[in-house]
Amino acid sequence: ESSPSSQKQPILQWRDYAKPGDVLPVYLPVLFDVEARKQMALNVTPYENQFYLNLTGWREDSRAFTFEFNQRGHQRYVIGEVSAADGSIRHLVDEQTKTFIYYYNNYRYDLDDGKELLWISERDGWRHLYLIDGTSGQVKRQVTKGEWVLRQVDYVDETNRVVYFTASGFNKGEDPYNLHYCRINLDGTGFTDMTPENGNHRVTFSADRSYFTDVYSRPDLPPVSQLKRTSDVSVVAGLQRCDVSALQAEGWQMPEVF
């Protein structure tokens, strides 16, 4: 501690941490039959070589609970479901690769209490969204596809089966890091770039999601804000365009894009 309140001199503090060769804690799913007052046997051997294993909750009807297993080395990631009836474990997702799974920004969304689930994967070489059959664990369809990157899912409209997300890299000749706000039906149809203007976009929706504000900019374009209608993505009104003329009058120059 460099500047303790109790004295002028630093205080040496010790921190105990695991080092190569040390025994590491292992977290495993456990199931108890409350009425019979006994622990049910689970086959947990496949999940012992772990970076982490997290329990992720029970199904609404209590038929099962789920967990996520990240194998040490980050080349396998499993979403498992444990049956409350007999303790059997089945894999809803078993993501495997020879390279690396970017586990930090994984995305999973359970539909209809696990009958389907949305899962982001890079299995085709690009980060895209997949619809998984929650009964069989098989891929029902690849929802998004192409030589571009799905950055983040923002909202899933379960009633209309539409997903809203940010993506980048699909507009040729544009900065591949520009974020665009998009939507697509869960059957893979109806892809719409809701913010087609050349720039990096940030959107904010109204409470009922009928309208949204879109603020976009580039290094060589001061921020522009618009009000848009969600249904047809039409521009309802231009709200503001940043004026940098005073800066330019003082000799400031916009960055040169290259």
Regions found by a protein language model. Give the residues of each.
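Non-catalytic accessory segments flanking enzyme active sites
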Residues: E1, D22-L28, Q39-N43, Y52-G57, ...
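Short, conserved, GDST-rich strand-edge loop motifs in beta-rich repeat architectures
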Residues: E1-L24, N70-H74, F165-Y177
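Blade/loop signatures of beta-propeller domains
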Residues: Y17, P25-V34
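Short loop/turn segments that connect beta-strands within beta-propeller blades
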Residues: V34-R37, A84-G87, G134-S136, N185-T189, ...
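Residue position within the beta-strands of beta-propeller blades
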Residues: A64-E68, E116-I120, V163-A167, F212-V215
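Residue-level signature of beta-propeller blades and closely related beta-rich strand-turn architectures
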Residues: Q71, R123-D124, G169, R218
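Repeat-blade elements of multi-bladed beta-propeller folds
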Residues: Y109-G114, D157-T166
